[in-house]
Amino acid sequence: MGKTVTAIGLMSGTSMDGIDVALLRTDGETIVDRGPSAGYTYDPAFRARLKTGLDDARSIVKREERPGTLADLEHELTLRHADAVRGFLHQNNILSESVDVVGFHGQTVLHRPDEALTVQLGDGDLLAQETGIDVVYDMRANDMAHGGQGAPLIPAYHAALAHELSKNGEIVAPAVFVNIGGISNLTFIGWRDEIVAYDSGPGNTLIDQWVEAHAGIPFDQGGMIASEGSVMRELAESYLSHPFFSAEKRRSLDRNDFAPPSGEAASLEDGARTLAHVTAAAIIRSAQHLPARPETYIVCGGGRLNPVIMRDLHMLAEAEGARVVAAEALRLNGDSMEAEAWAYLAVRSRCGLPLTYPGTTGVSRPVSGGRLARKPSRAETA
């Protein structure tokens, strides 16, 4: 085992609901310790600005461009991440000097893998200056430069977790990690540590957009709205018949690849119920492209907290002879897993270890990635 490094991971996902922070100790291969984690919610006004940023980003041709509000938005987003790091350190009585590196995802505002273009807002140099900690950021670009889709990146961390769980006899291969965030993705861990990963379809994004447009709330907490509705089979099938699910070549998704239904298509409750079903069914339908039928689906991300999604997923998986377990049943943290992954990837980046593989993003060969922003020297801060 190499030198153990203390890392903080920061994740602001496609749901745009806030910043997840997690601490991890690792040598870039073995997970030595999963530390504390926390979430810092964005206020409604800032969430609205982020959504405006998505519109501004549509005109980007080169990834360095920041048209419209994006330059100011990137600056504020970075400062909010710095505040989250400082608050997390204070809350957990951790000295910044004891943290070796921060893994900074930033906020994705554009992802066009067919054009080798991905844009995450986030100023790594500013974050390093504000926190006094080295920062690894921009971890998707090198994958795209080598022919990859730029996503998903979390499979390297899933593989490390699977190794830990299988060593303890808690899972048996083949197993699949399911992350239900704004977009859902699958990581298949097969026999002999084979890794295959890809986006599986819409996660929470469509439900969030639907209830925000029709009820003025950011998400369907606890699936309460969906639980009052019925699945509209024709509407569900209009999503599940999308060419994405039948294409032999897997690709990464942007939140704009699937749009919510029109306002007249369903009642609030039926729309939420149908979209919850689509989320679950998309996972099982996409799993048909895996090398083998999974024994276990390990579910993390915000979608695992929606009982309606989980109920449908259980039912559909059982019909395939598989079981579904929430991350917590295996002593994992389903809320902080992506933030933990970004801490893990930051350490791998510093060590020059691969972040992505041909089986995860379609990259031509295993490649590392990320840019390193150094913390200010003592002379600069004196």
From Swiss-Prot:
Organism: Sinorhizobium medicae (strain WSM419)
Entry protein name: Anhydro-N-acetylmuramic acid kinase
SUPFAM superfamilies, per database record: Actin-like ATPase domain
GO MF, one annotated term: phosphotransferase activity, alcohol group as acceptor
Residues reported in the UniProt entry to bind ATP: 13-20
InterPro entries membership: Anhydro_N_Ac-Mur_kinase, ATPase_NBD
GO terms, biological process: 1,6-anhydro-N-acetyl-beta-muramic acid catabolic process; amino sugar metabolic process; peptidoglycan turnover
Gene assigned in the entry: anmK
Pathway membership, UniProt: Amino-sugar metabolism; 1,6-anhydro-N-acetylmuramate degradation; Cell wall biogenesis; peptidoglycan recycling
Keyword Kinase: yes
Signal peptide: none
EC code: 2.7.1.170
Record's catalysed reaction(s): 1,6-anhydro-N-acetyl-beta-muramate + ATP + H2O = N-acetyl-D-muramate 6-phosphate + ADP + H(+)
Family, similarity comment: Belongs to the anhydro-N-acetylmuramic acid kinase family.
Xref: HAMAP family: AnhMurNAc_kinase (MF_01270)
Keyword line: ATP-binding, Carbohydrate metabolism, Kinase, Nucleotide-binding, Transferase
Functional description taken from the UniProt entry: Catalyzes the specific phosphorylation of 1,6-anhydro-N-acetylmuramic acid (anhMurNAc) with the simultaneous cleavage of the 1,6-anhydro ring, generating MurNAc-6-P. Is required for the utilization of anhMurNAc either imported from the medium or derived from its own cell wall murein, and thus plays a role in cell wall recycling.
